[in-house]
Amino acid sequence: LLWQDNKIVTGFTLADNRLTVRTNGQRGNALVAVYDAGGTILWSWHIWCLPNDRPQDDRYTNRAGEQFLVMDRNLGAIGTDLKTRYGLVYTWGRKDPFTSNEVYNAAGRKDRFINHWPTIYTSNGSEAKTYDLTYMTRHPTTYVYTGWYAKLYTYYDNALWGDPAPVDTCLLYTSP
């Protein structure tokens, strides 16, 4: 068990190359994994439980008259109302979700899901610029980012957006 958001997982069975996850019948999400003898994650699965509340298809029609079916909630959402429809967060190229909510760790204690933002280095000590599928599979709870784009959103600076106004003032904008 890597994390769960509602203590839904009650047990596991690993037999005949098959992982069985038992849940308590409540709504929620979990991320479970299998490891090798050395503790390296071999694969992980997102468990999404929605007893008695299966997602429905909503029909949408675009301006050209084409119809599309869209699930009535985001992947990982436990409901469709304002408080429960958000769901989980996926980053490009990753199969496993991230959550911004508090979760329960493997020890059963409340924890923040993403609790480290590591910089990955290559074997010669330089910062790694690419991450392969093997790394992502073995580190499903590690948020990987590089370069200026990621730092743009994680770096706090009041002048970030280039506002030329002095601190504690604002520019008035008017229409011509």
What are these regions (language model features)?
Residues Y173-T174:
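Conserved small/polar residues in nucleotide/adenosyl-binding loops
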Residues D16-R27:
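Extracellular/luminal low-complexity segments enriched in Ser/Thr/Pro
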Residues L2, H116-C170:
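Long, low-complexity, polar/charged, intrinsically disordered or flexibly structured peripheral segments
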Residues N105:
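Carboxylate/His-rich catalytic cores and anion/metal-binding grooves
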